[in-house]
């Protein structure tokens, strides 16, 4: 199956474990059942090591469930062509990667055909446009390897904007605003609520 109809997600009695090099299992998720409607903005809260990242990584099949089912648009994720599924599930992690090149070129890794207007709009939603405009060369500012010339919070916002340009059915932000201040985090969240 190649077409992902919408962004609805359901976890149906999902169990997940990691197996270490000795073959010992560490149970991370047990009997998780959850339904998320397409367009819904939710937060998953829990302490460090509680399985939040593991849970969301089951959606694009970075891992597979041990028991139960993860469904997207009503179909088990295992029924989708893996590449097609992953093109419709954008993930922005706490640790983000920027590439050498301009900001605009980095944004086009999310969508090669993105117009300048689409790039600016995505950056506005991600609260990146303001700091980009402060650079002498704006969107033509060169990014050093790994994004060494921007702060951690700026790097996170650029990666969120790049993910938005993919126009995915599902956008997962996994601790991806950890390096931004509370005000900026709230602004990003409010822009997502407006967009959805």
Regions from the language model: what does each represent?
Residues 2-196:
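ABC-type nucleotide-binding domain
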């Amino acid at each position: 199956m190649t077409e992902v109809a919408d962004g609805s997600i359901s976890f149906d009695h999902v169990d997940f474990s990691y197996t270490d090099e000795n073959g010992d299992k560490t149970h991370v998720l047990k009997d998780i059942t959850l339904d998320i409607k397409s367009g819904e903005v939710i937060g998953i809260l829990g302490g460090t090591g509680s399985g939040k990242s593991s849970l969301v990584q089951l959606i694009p099949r970075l891992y597979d469930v041990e028991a139960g089912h993860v469904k997207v648009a009503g179909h088990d994720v295992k029924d989708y062509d893996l590449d097609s599924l992953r093109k419709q599930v954008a993930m922005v992690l706490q640790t983000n990667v920027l590439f050498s090149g301009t900001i605009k070129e980095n944004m086009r890794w999310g969508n090669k055909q993105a117009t300048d207007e689409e790039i600016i709009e995505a950056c506005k939603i991600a609260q990146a446009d303001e700091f980009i405009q402060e650079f002498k060369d704006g969107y033509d500012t060169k990014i050093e390897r790994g994004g060494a010339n921007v702060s951690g919070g700026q790097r996170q916002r650029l990666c969120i904007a790049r993910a938005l340009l993919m126009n995915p059915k599902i956008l997962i932000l996994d601790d991806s605003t950890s390096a931004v201040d509370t005000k900026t985090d709230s602004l990003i969240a409010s822009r997502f609520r407006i967009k959805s």
